[in-house]
Amino acid sequence: MALKITQIKGTVGTKPKHRENLRSLGLKRIRHTVIRPDTPEVRGMILAVRHLIVVEEVAGE
């Protein structure tokens, strides 16, 4: 299973760690979407920035 992650809010005024997590997920701007594998590491990054993103489950790798 994979996760479709879309950034819905900007990073102005956020903590540096949150910006690092978004960059590690591959998100660069608002409405940018990436597909990442469903792993504990990715879930941890998602948990830290859940107020800035939307996550959907998709079939696939």
Swiss-Prot record:
Domain of life: Bacteria
Matches recorded under CDD domains: Ribosomal_L30
A GO molecular function held by the record: structural constituent of ribosome
One GO biological process term: translation
InterPro entries in alphabetical order: Ribo_uL30_ferredoxin-like_sf, Ribosomal_uL30_bac-type, Ribosomal_uL30_ferredoxin-like
GO CC annotations on file: cytosolic large ribosomal subunit
Assigned keywords, A-Z: Ribonucleoprotein, Ribosomal protein
Keyword Ubl conjugation: no
SUPFAM superfamilies: Ribosomal protein L30p/L7e
Subunit structure as annotated in this protein's UniProt entry: Part of the 50S ribosomal subunit.
Family note: Belongs to the universal ribosomal protein uL30 family.
Official protein name in the record: Large ribosomal subunit protein uL30
Source species of the chain: Corynebacterium glutamicum (strain ATCC 13032 / DSM 20300 / JCM 1318 / BCRC 11384 / CCUG 27702 / LMG 3730 / NBRC 12168 / NCIMB 10025 / NRRL B-2784 / 534)
Lineage: Bacteria, Bacillati, Actinomycetota, Actinomycetes, Mycobacteriales
Gene that specifies this protein: rpmD
